[in-house]
C-alpha cells in the first residue's frame, strides 16, 4: 500500500486528486493544474515534497567521503549553509541520482535525495560511507514544503518569528539555515525564487494551513512537472538514469574536473566519455498545433548530410509560453531545426538551449 505524507489529510481537505507516485500518495492537482502553474509564475504556490529523503551525515571524514562519492566537489562549500547540486554516479559514469548537499560544519553535511531512488541511494551511500566511519541518519521525522514564486518568500516570511526572519534576511540562492524548528533553504524546482522548508512532521499540517491562509496556493505534481520542464530542470529516470552519462544530460557543469588528482566514483569513465563524445540534451520548441511528448523520435540531418535520430525525454504544453516545449537527447551535430514524428505527421521544431523560462520570463 502506498505511503502517505503527514500532509495527506490537508491535501484531501484542499480537494486534491491523489495519485500513487513512486509508492507515495501525492496530489496530482487541486482542480486546475494550469491555475497552479500560473500561481507559481506570478504569485506563490506550494508543494508537499515530504516524499523526498533527507539524509544527515556526521563524522570527521564527511567532506573527504563526499569528495569521493559525488561528481561535484564539496571542497567548494566553505560557508556554513551553502549548498551545491551534484550527480552521484556509478563506476561506469551513469547517474544513480541527482541531489543537493548542504555543508554545516566539517563533521555535518546534509543530502536531499529523490523519493523514487531512496532505497538504492541509501544502500549506495551506506556501502561507500563505511570505510570513512560516517554516521548516517535518515530524517524521516521531517516533512518538507516547497514555497515557490515571486511572492513566495514574502508570504512565507509572515509565518516566521523574528529570529527566523533575521536568519533568512539577504540569504542568497542555494543556502540553507536551521532557524528554530525550521530548516529554510533557498532552493527549488520551478525556476522561481522561494524556499524549501523542512520541519517536524507533527508541525507540518499547521504550517501548511497557515500558508494557505497567507495566500499561498497548493500545487500538485502536474504543475511541478510543467514548471520544472519550463525551467529546464532534469527529472530522474527521464533525462538521466544509471545508463546515461551526466555529459548527455546537460549536467556537465556539475562535474568538478579540477583538481585533477581528486578521485571520485565514475571519474575514469567520464574522462573517456568526454574524450570520445556523448549525446547531448537540447531544448525543442514547436509553435504549431500539437504537443511534444516523451519518447517521440527527433530526426535531423547534420552539416555533412548524415541523418541522425534522438528522443524526447520530457515534453509538454508550456502554460507560460503558450506552445509546446521539450527536452531531447540527441547525437552531436544537430543544427537549429529538427523534425519530430507525431503519429503520422512530421512536425518541424526549433532547437534551443535546454531552458525555456526563468523568473516568469521567456529565455531568449
Swiss-Prot record:
InterPro entries, sorted: GCS_T (IPR006223), GCS_T_bac (IPR022903), GCST_C (IPR013977), GCV_T_N (IPR006222), GcvT/YgfZ/DmdA (IPR028896), GcvT/YgfZ_C (IPR029043), TrmE/GcvT_dom1 (IPR027266)
GO MF: aminomethyltransferase activity; transaminase activity
Domain of life: Bacteria
A Pfam family this chain is assigned to: GCV_T
Keywords in alphabetical order: Aminotransferase, Transferase
Top class in the EC scheme: transferase
Function recorded in the entry: The glycine cleavage system catalyzes the degradation of glycine.
Oligomer and partners: The glycine cleavage system is composed of four proteins: P, T, L and H.
Stated family: Belongs to the GcvT family.
Protein name per UniProt: Aminomethyltransferase
Gene name tied to this protein: gcvT
